[in-house]
Amino acid sequence: MKKIMLLLMTLLLVSLPLAQEAQADASVYSYQGIISHMAPPASPPAKPKTPVEKKNAAQIDQYIQGLDYDKNNILVYDGEAVKNVPPKAGYKEGNQYIVVEKKKKSINQNNADIQVINSLASLTYPGALVKANSELVENQPDVLPVKRDSVTLSIDLPGMVNHDNEIVVQNATKSNINDGVNTLVDRWNNKYSEEYPNISAKIDYDQEMAYSESQLVAKFGAAFKAVNNSLNVNFGAISEGKVQEEVINFKQIYYTVNVNEPTSPSRFFGKSVTKENLQALGVNAENPPAYISSVAYGRDIFVKLSTSSHSTRVKAAFDTAFKGKSVKGDTELENIIQNASFKAVIYGGSAKDEVEIIDGDLSKLRDILKQGANFDKKNPGVPIAYTTNFLKDNQLAVVKNNSEYIETTSKAYSDGKINLDHSGAYVARFNVTWDEVSYDANGNEVVEHKKWSENDKDKLAHFTTSIYLPGNARNINIHAKECTGLAWEWWRTVVDDRNLPLVKNRNVCIWGTTLYPAYSDTVDNPIK
């Protein structure tokens, strides 16, 4: 009997840990859904690996950490190379003479943030594994189709406590990650939005006067190519000096979702993934693995400002209009703004998730920028930018953009006139000469001497006339003399003004008597 009792007690003691282990397994399995909704740890818990899985992980870590590449030069965009600079040129346009000048310029920009537009949004999610290669530079990330382990996401919306801003995604596929992001946003909307009713978007904007597509791609990233299909920057007219355009990228960032850094490269892969799998997918030193470490969600606006003005203050006028500052009292800036237009391409900021294109005059621009300034349920964010880190060492992957381009500047010289007025008691003669400047095919200045057809002809009082001069007139000389009737000084000089600048209205008047002539030279509305 004692033996039987001893046997029963032994069986009971053995079965108790087995039951506890089975219960623990069931508990683990119950949390193997897509997303853990409990407060997650700082990094996702990992199941013990089998010997084969440990070997796979060790080989992956050794392979990726052994890849030899220069992180500063693997993501490089080399745009246009300018060999020949077109010469200076000039042409007549209405009542102005336009001088167009070209200069070789270069732009070198390091971009840690990569723009997202709607056509790429499906490829962009926090934690995505991509190759750091030319496709990433061109904003066409090559996502690695491998099985994934769990990742921890965090969001930077305010007020979230007790790890409410974090979530563990057990199987980091695109759909599961997106579900995780939506869960974080819903959690904030349900628990914290009433306490923080007006979350102002973080504002980030950059701007560049437009000269070539290569220049703007270097400035804003490869996404600009697709944006310009709607923006339609008129590079041809810009090159001819007929228009001036500026492109502004205005981001309203509602929130950013980050991915916890992996403690080792293998931590981002499913346990069945091998080094050979990665090699077969083309992962090597020329195509090292990287991951999308953060994604900014919000509203992204590209604005093109355009004017046919040849003023050198166009950029100042555009900047003033964009910032909503007053230009009252500055006639030149007022005229530029009143005669300028804009075109905006808007991504995000509405529940419809559509791309919006708006045209108008600059007075309406500020209203568009104010829309979507706050994050709420009516203004859901879309992916607008992302950053990538190298999986080897979690170092930031920066895209180096370089391009040369031709900067085109134009200057308008308005036509002017000289008004002659003779009311003196004598016979007078005028002599008016000037130079007209143009440019040959090589950009060399060509100077042609001109003179008034009525030079040195007798004029009796009261005589008036106007001599119209083109905008390229320079070195204006005005000479007037009067007949005194004196044998020893038959002609006396009244006016001898030389190398005068062209102005809108120059009034030269002579009067008086043969012995006491007089004159005046006044200017109305001088041309600046």
UniProtKB/Swiss-Prot annotation:
Cellular compartments annotated: Secreted; Host membrane
Where does the protein principally reside?
secreted
**Residues making up the signal peptide according to the UniProt record:** 1-23
Membrane-topology descriptor: Multi-pass membrane protein
PROSITE patterns listed in its UniProt record:
THIOL_CYTOLYSINS
Gene Ontology molecular-function annotations: cholesterol binding; toxin activity
Which Gene3D superfamilies does the record associate with it? 3.30.1040.20, Perfringolysin, Perfringolysin, domain 4, Thiol-activated cytolysin superfamily/Thiol-activated cytolysin, alpha-beta domain
Recorded hits in Pfam families, A to Z, give:
Thiol_cytolys_C, Thiol_cytolysin
TM spans (from-to): 213-226, 233-242, 311-320, 328-340
What biological-process GO terms show up in the record?
killing of cells of another organism
Q: Which UniProt keywords apply?
A: Cytolysis, Hemolysis, Host membrane, Lipid-binding, Membrane, Secreted, Signal, Toxin, Transmembrane, Transmembrane beta strand, Virulence
Q: Name one GO cellular component term.
A: membrane
Q: Which InterPro entries match?
A: Thiol_cytolys_C (IPR035390), Thiol_cytolys_C_sf (IPR038700), Thiol_cytolysin (IPR001869), Thiol_cytolysin_ab_sf (IPR036363), Thiol_cytolysin_sf (IPR036359)
Q: Where is this motif: Cholesterol binding?
A: 514-515
* Motif placement: Conserved undecapeptide: 482-492
Q: Which family, according to UniProt? A: Belongs to the cholesterol-dependent cytolysin family.
**What does the subunit section of this Swiss-Prot or TrEMBL entry state?**
Homooligomeric pore complex of 35 to 50 subunits; when inserted in the host membrane.
Role noted for this protein: A cholesterol-dependent toxin that causes cytolysis by forming pores in cholesterol containing host membranes. After binding to target membranes, the protein undergoes a major conformation change, leading to its insertion in the host membrane and formation of an oligomeric pore complex. Cholesterol is required for binding to host membranes, membrane insertion and pore formation; cholesterol binding is mediated by a Thr-Leu pair in the C-terminus. Can be reversibly inactivated by oxidation.
The name on file for this protein is Ivanolysin
Q: Which organism is it from?
A: Listeria ivanovii
**Taxonomic lineage per UniProt?**
Bacteria, Bacillati, Bacillota, Bacilli, Bacillales
